[in-house]
Amino acid sequence: MERTDIQMKKVLVLEDESSIRSFIVINLRRAGYDVIEAETGEEALEKLKENPNTKVALLDIMLPGIDGFEVCRRIRATNSKIGIIMLTARSQEMDKVTGLMTGADDYVTKPFSPAELTARVD
């Protein structure tokens, strides 16, 4: 279903692997989302400052520089309303608990389907 400009939800995708980031971005755009891309945690935080109306942030955990857990903490310190979804290959229970305790609303492990991703972002 295509969205009108008024309905379009802005989503930040933080993923350092370009092929995975492209897969996520293509599928979200096909679903009608306005997507902002970031390759590092620092870049993601800067893009969120530039785009304060972002509704959802998809965060990988394993990144160069600051990791996704720290990005999540920093986002939550300044924005309690944005939806945060950890999107990672790390599937251990402790990682999931850490993600949720740092402020994530959801935790999705790779691999995932485009349909699952879109359903969680909605």
Where are these regions (language model features)?
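Conserved acidic carboxylate
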Residues: 15, 63
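The short loop immediately C-terminal to the conserved phospho-acceptor aspartate in CheY-like receiver
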Residues: 57, 61-62, 90
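The feature encodes the CheY-like receiver
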Residues: 64, 92, 110
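Acidic, metal-coordinating helix/loop segments flanking the phosphotransfer/catalytic sites
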Residues: 37-56
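Charged docking surfaces used in two-component/phosphorelay signaling
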Residues: 22-30
